[in-house]
Amino acid sequence: MTATVVIGSQWGDEGKGKIIDFLGQSADVTVRYSGGDNAGHSLVVNDQKLALRLIPSGILAPNSICIIGNGTVINPATLLDEIKELNGVGVNTDHLKISDRAHIVFPYHILQDQQQERDRSKNGEKIGTTNKGIGPAYMDKMQRIGIRAIDLLDNETLEEKIAFNLEQKKRILDEDLWNQLPSLKELTAQYIEYGEILKDYITDTSYLIHTNLNDNKRVLFEGAQGTMLDIDHGTYPFVTSSNPTAGGAATGAGIGVTKIKHVIGVCKSYVSRVGEGPFPTEQINEVGDRIREIAHEYGTVTKRPRRIGWFDGVLMKYVSEVNGLTDLVVNCLDVLSGFKELKICTGYQTDHGVIKYYPASEKELKNSTPIYETLPGWDEDLTQMTTYEELPANAKNYLKKIEEITGVPVSAFSIGPDREQTIVLNDMWSD
């Protein structure tokens, strides 16, 4: 029995999909446990690049079970589009399963999201939401008025719950947004149809996961986004509405924490971020522009240019502790080729002195000045290398410095976007 969790160790977009695809070839079950269609991951199928938002990366492994867990919020329209797109390139989705406890996104959630962001913008407090309705869907979940996947299979219950929710939203939504909503009859008919199409996918996925763990199967949990977007542990309020951290795998999939053997943190050799919020090591200069263009740093879902910064060791130490990381995977090492010098942040200079921890205060983060350790770079092209031994000495030292700061071994690193460009140093499936 092996349960392995893969989490993003920065602000998302760390390349988790590639690593999950790589590890997923040996997994019997792959589980997405948090978030919704606000989080995108890219996969390559038959030389075609696909951008998935809901379906786990493990869908490409035909002999494994692919699960969307109870901790997610699902927009059925997006999900069906993804199923259609995958089928169109020859990927069978019959092994996809959806938790009957997962909550469902409705059009009123999306409109509520737009209204909230519009109101925040008036006060200069824009968060940078993707306007996919994720936050409002989680709000309804916490207020205990949400509609779950299981409700899509009971027409009478579904209509009653939609009617109740529409009454609530009419009190909340501005008139111009309220008028964009379908009628109760239209909305109910649409979601009954979704239920008919998805009924064979919807099941008790927690039971399914436990059955496989008890049969000594390998279960891979894939987190969306990243630790620094976690509702509890991220750079609040510039965060998502769920828990993409390792702890979220237990609640978002319905398993006990003692079942988890490995927690793999995926990070880049530098840092990127989409949207608003503090970013101590951000490089709004030639360095940031250069990395962005080399690595094509634009959001999978939003297409927005990502903000770029030097590797933040303070952040990574915090992330390793919050998640209990057992392994690190460092992506995009090849992107740093050609830099004469590389910098790693080892502390923050604040108004109160030097700190080595990641502060909760947004104000303190914004006013922090990173303290850097400078390392020599390398000129060699890494993309054709196949072993750790081939790396130039300075690239090896860069990885060793990351291990030293985090206290977590680098078990794999990538030197390009393809699965074959992942070099594994330690077994991340061992019992």
UniProtKB/Swiss-Prot annotation:
Its main location: cytoplasm. Pathway: Purine metabolism; AMP biosynthesis via de novo pathway; AMP from IMP: step 1/2. Keywords: Cytoplasm, GTP-binding, Ligase, Magnesium, Metal-binding, Nucleotide-binding, Purine biosynthesis. Plays an important role in the de novo pathway of purine nucleotide biosynthesis. Catalyzes the first committed step in the biosynthesis of AMP from IMP. It catalyses: IMP + L-aspartate + GTP = N(6)-(1,2-dicarboxyethyl)-AMP + GDP + phosphate + 2 H(+). Its cofactor is Mg(2+). Belongs to the adenylosuccinate synthetase family. InterPro entries: Adenylosuccin_syn_GTP-bd, Adenylosuccin_syn_Lys_AS, Adenylosuccinate_synth_dom1, Adenylosuccinate_synth_dom2, Adenylosuccinate_synth_dom3, Adenylosuccinate_synthetase, P-loop_NTPase. Gene3D superfamilies: Adenylosuccinate Synthetase, subunit A, domain 1, Adenylosuccinate Synthetase, subunit A, domain 2, Adenylosuccinate Synthetase, subunit A, domain 3. This is Adenylosuccinate synthetase. Its EC number is 6.3.4.4. It is an enzyme of class 6 (ligase). IMP binds at D13, E14, G15, K16, N38, A39, G40, H41, T130, R144, Q225, T240, R304. It comes from Pediococcus pentosaceus (strain ATCC 25745 / CCUG 21536 / LMG 10740 / 183-1w). Substrate binds at T300, V301, T302, K303, R304, P305, R306. GTP binds at residues 12-18, 40-42, 306, 332-334, 414-416. GO terms for biological process: 'de novo' AMP biosynthetic process; IMP metabolic process. Mg(2+) binds at D13, G40. GO terms for molecular function: adenylosuccinate synthase activity; GTP binding; magnesium ion binding. Residues 114-133 are annotated as: Disordered. The lineage of its organism: Bacteria, Bacillati, Bacillota, Bacilli, Lactobacillales. The gene is purA.
